[in-house]
Amino acid sequence: MEKILTEVFGIWYLIRAAFVFFMQAGFAMVEAGFTRAKNAGNIIMKNLMDFCLGTVAFLIIGYSLLMGQDFAGLVGWGESPLTDFAGTNWSSFTFNLVFCATAATIVSGAMAERTKFISYCIYSFVISLIVYPIEAHWVWGGGWLSSLGFHDFAGSAAIHYVGGLTALIGAWMLGPRIGKFDKDGTPRGIPGHSLTIGALGCFILWFGWYGFNGAAATNGIQLATIFATTTVAPAVATCTVMLITWIKYGKPDVAMCLNGSLAGLVAITAGCDAVNVFGSFVIGILSGCMVCFIVWLLDYKLKVDDPVGAVAVHFGNGVLGTICVGLFACGTDTMPEAQGLFYGGGFHLLGVQLLGLLAIGAWTAVTMFITFYIIKKTVGLRVSAHEEIVGLDKMEHGLESAYAGFALEADVPGDYLETIQDSSYTPSVELDDAVPTKVIHSDGSISKVVIITKAEKFDKIKAALNEIGIGGMTVTKVSGCGVQKGQTSYYRGAKVNMELLPKLKVEVVVSEVPVADVVKAAKKALYTGNIGDGKIFVYDVADVVRISTGARGKDALKYED
């Protein structure tokens, strides 16, 4: 039976490695969704190369540095898997590789939209070759931190803290994106192009996290405990962020809530096996507060531009999660020796956790600062202003768009929106009293009427114009918005500049049909009393020329049967 269980958990080990690999897709979707469409292809490429370059680096020497024969508690050493196929534990190699790739890919989002691709590739190779393997050896490879009792079950410190700290250094050295801060330093929200994609990425990551945290479980009880704590912490963190943003901004912030879910997952990672459900509940509350605070701190005090919240999620909550082990570890059945300050363990474990953070942070900060500095002074770290404005898809990869053939507009069913708008608001006055019609005529006998309205109103306006005898019109998709005094919108805690919304421009030229009838028909079709019903513009037309016949004026508007 023992042999069977060993085989079962060995298979589980590799299945969970596949779960963690799938998290690369989650990171790619979160980062792509939280950034602008002109950089989506670049984001995907960076996440792909994180894993591919990381595999090469890990194969050459990274795995040996992590899991090789311990040397003085500082580094592992042994033959490279590249030349020692028979002597390599390939289950361990695969498992540790996907964890290494996770640490590397965290940085992509914080440095998004302005980093040279070649520079990012160099960074990715270095962190997978040397930086991550050495500090991970201290924690999991038999190094000096593990001998002191440092507890980081699945990587709050070894993976997320390292990735988040590297992201902070990289984003700081890069500087903010163009338009992120006003001249007086006020931060401006730059919304990502698809929260839908970002949310998909968040759910993929949450799903993968069950493998991320549960992969090293050695029995069913421990696995069940890990699944429970890995569920409770992010759920509570998300609720916490929702309440904070709802109270602070008047409405719950979707992007921040997605960050809150990831923050809770990061914070519980270190102690997922060592805390109980109450501890994970408290950790969830703390991580929700932490992610909101760090986002505010970066934007309003440090002026560091982090497009996706990688620093707040991974650095801030990597620190928090590691410290919380020293506070809330309760000596579970599977980890009886791990007891935190609040469960009678005194300050010993807490002190070891703090020492581990200090050591890992110092190693990461020094090595990654040197790496980024050398890159900056050689190949350069940041693209030019022109390249940033055009977009990295075009300038770095020759890609016109990651969405070729798709219009990047909100495609919302018109009937649904009309039902919501028309049924939820009753105009205080009648149409003619609310918007009196007065058409001023000039000497011209031909007029052009331009109607700007929402796309979902097109069927109504077309039917209304057809009813008064207008069968010809020009319809164009345009973008625009009105500015309503006193309304302020926020994205991830920062005010958002004016955003353009998809509209339709309907143009008709009339000579026989009175302009007043056209205006009245349009008003009747569009009026709800809500902001955004649209606008009508009336112009005089000096002349009309039909190209096919040469007819001019009113004759050019007539069609022969």
Language model features with spans:
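Positively charged, small/polar-rich N-terminal and surface patches that mediate targeting and assembly
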Residues: 395-402, 413-561
